[in-house]
């Protein structure tokens, strides 16, 4: 059965508070599966399985699938629809509260697939990256504007701290755009399927990741300010900051949105050296 048929079969009522929009376009489903590149060696962690339409396709291809679902009304539906699969584990929990490192422990070749409610997209991606969870890739359907921020380059309005965070740890690839007409109920925004391939090492080597991300965050807090004014929040004396900018070869009159990840790394290391 397809998604609409399963929804009708169980007379499922969508929960607006959970931001539920179920994918009904099979071509998008196929592109997610193709993009995720799932094999029998892979353990898949799926966030937001809905009524299990994508989950079935994952179960047919993966070694095992762990699906995380918050909505208690979906649990019996998933249990019934997927009862024939012995490689399926259903976790009834909020993905924001999951111990991902614990879940991934002693598992090889972990790939994540997610159709996230838009309000939890950034918190979950940030957690997976900052907590250094051991996964190979994350194939995710998210709001178009967020995907464009993740995949952005310097000198554009989409480029920001989320861009730097994700691209510090991952390569990014936009797989396809998804129209609101591909969902029930129909959302008010366009979506994009994007894949994040985890790098074996961060894109740049820095002396302090904590300082690096503090510099990045401060540089984008007030986008129209120069780096000199933005980085005053670090509470470093004027002479030391002048020295750091000079050693990094970066004009303090530039704005954060003009710096590459490599330049942020160079600047944060020069600040680290003078602290």
From Swiss-Prot:
Primary localization class, coarse: cytoplasm
UniProt-listed SMART domains: rADc
GO cellular component, one term: cytosol
Enzyme class: transferase
Keywords: Cytoplasm, Methyltransferase, RNA-binding, rRNA processing, S-adenosyl-L-methionine, Transferase
The protein, known as: Ribosomal RNA small subunit methyltransferase A
Binding-site residues for S-adenosyl-L-methionine, renumbered to this chain: 21, 23, 48, 69, 94, 115
Catalytic activity field: adenosine(1518)/adenosine(1519) in 16S rRNA + 4 S-adenosyl-L-methionine = N(6)-dimethyladenosine(1518)/N(6)-dimethyladenosine(1519) in 16S rRNA + 4 S-adenosyl-L-homocysteine + 4 H(+)
Gene of this entry: rsmA
Keyword Cytoplasm: yes
Described function: Specifically dimethylates two adjacent adenosines (A1518 and A1519) in the loop of a conserved hairpin near the 3'-end of 16S rRNA in the 30S particle. May play a critical role in biogenesis of 30S subunits.
């Amino acid at each position: 059965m397809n998604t609409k048929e399963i929804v009708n079969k169980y007379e499922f009522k969508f929960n607006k508070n959970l931001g539920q929009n179920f994918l009904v376009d099979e071509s998008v489903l196929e592109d997610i599966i193709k993009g995720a590149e799932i094999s029998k060696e892979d353990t898949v962690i799926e966030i937001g399985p809905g009524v299990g339409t994508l989950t079935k396709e994952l179960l047919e291809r993966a070694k095992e699938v762990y699906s995380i679902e918050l909505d208690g009304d979906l649990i019996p539906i998933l249990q019934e629809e997927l009862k024939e699969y012995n490689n399926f584990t259903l976790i009834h929990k909020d993905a924001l509260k999951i111990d991902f490192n614990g879940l991934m422990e002693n598992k090889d070749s972990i790939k994540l697939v997610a159709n996230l409610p838009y309000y939890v997209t950034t918190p979950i991606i940030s957690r997976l990256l900052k907590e250094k969870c051991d996964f190979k890739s994350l194939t995710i359907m998210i709001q178009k504007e967020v995907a464009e921020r993740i995949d952005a380059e310097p000198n554009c309005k989409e480029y920001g701290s989320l861009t730097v965070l994700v691209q510090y740890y991952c390569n990014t690839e936009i797989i396809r755009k998804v129209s609101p007409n591909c969902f029930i109920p129909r959302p008010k925004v366009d979506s994009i399927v994007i894949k994040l391939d985890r790098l074996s090492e961060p894109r740049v080597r820095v002396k302090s990741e904590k300082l690096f991300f503090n510099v990045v965050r401060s540089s984008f807090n007030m986008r129209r300010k120069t780096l000199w004014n933005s980085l005053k929040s670090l509470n470093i004396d004027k002479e030391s900051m002048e020295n750091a900018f000079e050693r990094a070869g970066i004009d303090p009159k530039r704005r954060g949105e003009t710096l590459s990840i490599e330049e942020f790394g160079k600047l944060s290391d020069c600040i680290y050296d003078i602290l």
